[in-house]
A protein has these predicted regions:
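Short coil-to-beta microelement around the adenine-binding A-loop and adjacent beta1/P-loop entry
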Residues: 14-15, 74, 182
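Conserved beta-strand-loop-alpha-helix hinge in the C-terminal portion
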Residues: 215, 219, 223-246
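Q-loop/switch helix immediately C-terminal to the Walker
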Residues: 82-86, 92-108, 120-123
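Walker B catalytic motif
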Residues: 168-172, 179
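Conserved structural motif at the start of ABC-family nucleotide-binding domains
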Residues: 2-4, 17-19
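ABC ATPase C-loop
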Residues: 159-160
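The feature captures the beta-strand-to-loop junction immediately N-terminal to the Walker
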Residues: 33-38
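ABC ATPase NBD Q-loop/coupling interface
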Residues: 59-75, 143
Length: 251
């Protein structure tokens, strides 16, 4: 599904990604952990095409297509989804209109007919149940006046509606209490299929206990320096990153 080869990227004159190699197959969940400033959020931003970042070297293929040649909106239409660490508010734009426009833009890109109102409302009802989203939230402006937990739940609802092939959750657990985290994790788990994959970027293993990735990668100074299974997240939670720095020859 996703193949990243020797990816280098910078913002301004500062190089942040310094040779990322990563392969994600259909149906896999990968977690990316690492100290602050290691490049985790930069990687997600580069994958979705944030224009603030410049790719200076490397290749990225998404389902066999050159991702780096695509516009950000085309990456989304191809099935890439990013859940932001800090979701933005869009006053005056209702969730219903926002989601209907997003879905029909994707359908247009794929050569499909627009979804009519009845089909859309039925889909909205089905997906709202999955993430336990209050119908009142679905009728308000996008994220306006939402609590932190409501914003995150709303993003998982958007993910459910858009049915992406690869979802990137960038510190979705940031600021969530355990109950809200469980609802987010349950939603993500229910949406996983053998054809869809997920990247979970996090500092903590609590979310990973609920989502359970098959692979855990440690990003440090712009490179993936260690890969393991769920047990790696446990070791990091208990012992921090110093032992990994020692392992790769850094103090």
């Amino acid at each position: 599904m996703l193949e990243v080869k020797n990816l280098h990227a910078k913002i301004g004159e500062k190089e942040i990604l310094k040779g990322i190699d990563l392969v994600i197959n259909d149906g896999e969940t990968h977690a990316i952990m690492g100290p602050n400033g290691s490049g985790k959020s930069t990687l997600s931003a580069v994958l979705v095409g944030n224009p603030l970042y410049e790719v200076t070297e490397g290749e990225v293929y998404f389902n066999g297509k050159n991702l780096l040649e695509m516009k950000p909106e085309d990456r989304a239409h191809e099935g890439l989804f990013l859940s932001f660490q800090y979701p933005v508010e869009i006053p005056g734009v209702s969730m219903t209109n926002f989601m209907k426009a997003a879905i029909n833009e994707k359908r247009k890109y794929l050569g499909l007919e627009p979804m009519n109102a009845a089909e859309f409302l039925q889909l909205q009802r089905e997906k709202r149940k999955i993430v336990e989203l209050d119908s009142k939230l679905a009728n308000r402006s996008v994220n306006e006046g939402f609590s932190g937990g409501e914003k995150k739940r709303n993003e998982i609802f958007q993910m459910a509606m858009l049915e992406p092939k690869l979802s990137i959750l960038d510190e979705t657990d940031s600021g969530l209490d355990v109950d809200a985290m469980r609802i987010v994790a349950d939603g993500v788990n229910k949406l996983q299929t053998p054809e869809t994959s997920c990247i979970v970027i996090t500092h903590y293993d609590r979310l990973l206990e609920m989502i359970r990735p098959q692979f855990v990668h440690v990003l440090y100074k712009g490179r993936i320096v260690k890969t393991g299974g769920p047990e790696l997240a446990k070791e990091i939670q208990e012992h921090g990153y110093d032992w990994i720095k020692e392992e790769i020859g850094e103090e």
